């Protein structure tokens, strides 16, 4: 299977990047005009925390995307080190099914870990900076909704890697674009309904499901489902494959998280100091 990037893929990529960046800018005037200063501050505090949560996925998406590309290009065996040679025109669907099992396992654990941290350490931090959840109405409930939205955003993230790795660049960008447009429409509509900051939190919670649905429909074609339907994957195969992938991913993961913490730790200290 040959993977080609066309001009349409590039154009859709630009559209996707624009809306990923512009979605916050488009919603911002409505947030500033319809929310109190305390709610605006709380919203940006959650966004700051959300940037750290996104680091949980910073190394895994490229890793899964790269290895999915190997598999759909005909690679029959994955290696920890060395050059992987493509010695076949046939896709090893058993290994593809194993990779899907690894992706689900990894992202399930990452998202659950992030949710636990948000509901424990994150809740303590928010309690401190909101003066015991009193500065903003329903602050605790808003934080729980935000934590759940972060959970689903991380859990569904591997679909982007699957589409990219299988050469469906345009389709991946369409899914991302649809999700961001849904976020914009939901945020503005719910703000006009008078839900306040809950509007943004609910939009963040609901919009990823649209992206996930579209991504699923694009990646899991009937042909792919027919090929992997009868594959029996053992837990040992999933663990062994993960060890191969983790060998190089851990280095990038530690480096990225360390760099981010060094550059942005001051924001969290400022939040505690100014609370």
Predicted regions and their residues:
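Membrane-embedded alpha-helical segments of multi-pass transporters/permeases
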Residues: 25, 29, 55-59, 115-123, ...
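Membrane-interface junctions at transmembrane-helix termini in multi-pass inner-membrane proteins
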Residues: 150-176, 198
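Hydrophobic alpha-helical transmembrane segments
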Residues: 144, 174-230
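Alpha-helical transmembrane segments of multi-pass membrane proteins
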Residues: 116-128, 132-156, 173
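Residue-level recognition of pore/gate-forming positions within transmembrane alpha-helices
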Residues: 17, 21, 48-51, 150, ...
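Interhelical loop/hinge segments that connect adjacent transmembrane helices in multipass membrane
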Residues: 1-6, 215-264
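Signature of the first transmembrane helix
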Residues: 5-74, 250-272
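Membrane-water interface segments that mark the loop-to-transmembrane alpha-helix transition
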Residues: 8-12, 17, 58, 62-127
């Amino acid at each position: 299977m040959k993977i080609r990037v066309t001009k349409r893929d590039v154009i859709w990529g630009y559209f996707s990047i624009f809306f990923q960046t512009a979605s916050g800018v488009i919603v911002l005037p409505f947030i500033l005009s319809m929310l109190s200063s305390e709610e605006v501050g709380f919203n940006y505090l959650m966004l700051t925390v959300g940037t750290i949560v996104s680091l949980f996925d910073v190394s895994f998406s490229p890793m899964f995307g790269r290895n999915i590309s190997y598999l759909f290009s005909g690679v029959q065996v994955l290696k920890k080190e060395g050059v992987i040679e493509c010695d076949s025109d046939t896709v090893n669907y058993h290994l593809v099914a194993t990779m899907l099992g690894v992706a689900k396992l990894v992202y399930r654990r990452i998202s659950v870990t992030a949710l636990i941290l948000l509901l424990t350490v994150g809740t303590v931090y928010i309690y401190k900076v909101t003066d015991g959840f009193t500065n903003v109405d329903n602050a605790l409930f808003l934080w729980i909704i935000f934590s759940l939205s972060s959970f689903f955003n991380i859990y569904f993230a591997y679909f982007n890697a699957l589409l990219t790795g299988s050469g469906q660049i345009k389709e991946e960008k369409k899914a991302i674009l649809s999700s961001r447009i849904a976020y914009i429409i939901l945020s503005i509509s719910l703000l006009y309904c008078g839900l306040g900051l809950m509007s943004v939190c609910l939009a963040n919670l609901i919009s990823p499901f649209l992206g996930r649905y579209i991504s699923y429909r694009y990646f899991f074609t009937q042909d792919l489902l027919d090929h992997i339907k009868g594959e029996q994957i053992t837990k040992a195969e999933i663990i062994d494959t993960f060890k191969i992938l983790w060998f190089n991913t851990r280095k990038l993961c530690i480096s990225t998280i360390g760099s981010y913490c060094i550059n942005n730790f001051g924001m969290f200290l400022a939040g505690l100091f100014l609370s």
